[in-house]
Amino acid sequence: MGFTDETVRFDFDDNRKKAISETLETVYRALEEKGYNPINQIVGYLLSGDPAYIPRYQDARNLIRRHERDEIMEELTKYYLANHGIDIK
């Protein structure tokens, strides 16, 4: 792969979205594998900030704590609205 003379744009927002998405997928699977209701547990964590809602299994607790709760909620809200026909600016 060669280099180009054109400026490459780095979009931090896209990388953040991807990281949050991957984290939520991992956490969801870990909760499911442990027999919990993943939605209830994630909502409990987001509302309370108490990491005890998320198991240490598959490093899920450490992964989710890498993101600010408000950033996770922001991405979830944007995703929901965008998938319901709302143009997010």
Swiss-Prot record:
InterPro entries: IreB. It comes from the Bacteria. Belongs to the UPF0297 family. This is UPF0297 protein EF_1202.
